[in-house]
Design a protein with these regions (language model features):
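Active-site catalytic microenvironments in core metabolic enzymes, especially phosphate/sugar-handling
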Residues: 1-238
């Protein structure tokens, strides 16, 4: 994490904020004459993007070389933004309209929990999650009883399911859940909603852009318009 690409001494006037640094995001930054991209997910040296070579004929190498040749720098975060006050999970709780949000279990842990102003059936809450996060669809499982106390974990936070149960939550909103996690949830007494990795983390980009504008008023800070959810859903009958 930190500055992963670029010149630490370079002057910065325009900043682009995005969840991921993709080819489209890099092209947008170049077109907007930005000097810096700030992202949540690292563009290199993480478990899903290990850097062994930087070659023009590989997708990752092509992206990294484009960034460097354009004079762009990249500052990337990850779990530090997940856990930070006002970070990924606080932004997710706010996007869902949770009241009295607080840590889920460990005071310094990643996930958050809060309550809905009024209880609602699971299906209605799943629809609310989908619309609030502007997701293309959500997966959910559990009985249709009322939902009031909600745990949230942006990104792949399925490992915190037991913490949500221990806290007495009615439902856990996260992403990247497996078939067996859904299957086992009923026996554990918890409802699950998988709203997707991008939709559960993307709300923080708006928060981060606003924070940077306030912290550095001399900079022009823009949230990426080109980075969108890549996963689509086909539902029979639609």
């Amino acid at each position: 994490v930190g500055q992963l690409l670029g010149d630490p001494e370079a002057e910065v006037r325009r900043v682009l904020v995005a969840l991921d640094i993709t080819e489209a995001v890099a092209d947008e930054a170049i077109a907007e004459n930005c000097q810096l991209i700030v992202s949540h997910h690292p563009v290199m040296n993480c478990k899903w993007l290990p850097v062994q070579t930087v070659r023009q004929d590989t997708p990752q190498g092509h992206l990294l070389l484009k960034i460097l040749r354009s004079g762009l720098s990249a500052i990337c975060m990850h779990t530090n933004l997940d856990v930070a006050p006002g970070g990924v999970n606080d932004a997710l709780a706010a996007a869902l309209g949770l009241e009295d949000p607080g840590p889920l279990g460990d005071p310094e842990g990643l996930c958050r929990m809060g309550t809905l102003a009024s209880p609602m059936p699971l299906q209605e809450f799943a629809k609310h999650v989908c619309r609030a996060l502007q997701a293309n669809g959500v997966r959910y499982a559990g009985d249709s009883g009322p939902v009031r106390k909600v745990a949230v974990g942006g990104g792949a936070c399925g490992d915190y399911e037991d913490a949500a149960i221990a806290a007495g939550c009615d439902v856990f909103v996260t992403s990247d859940l497996s078939y067996h996690q859904f299957l086992d949830a009923a026996g554990k007494g918890i409802r699950l909603i998988d709203a997707g990795h991008f939709p559960t983390e993307n709300p923080v980009c708006t928060v981060l852009a606003e924070y940077l504008r306030g912290r550095f008023p001399g900079l022009t800070v823009t949230k990426s318009a080109s980075h969108r959810e890549v996963i689509q859903y086909y539902v029979e009958g639609e």
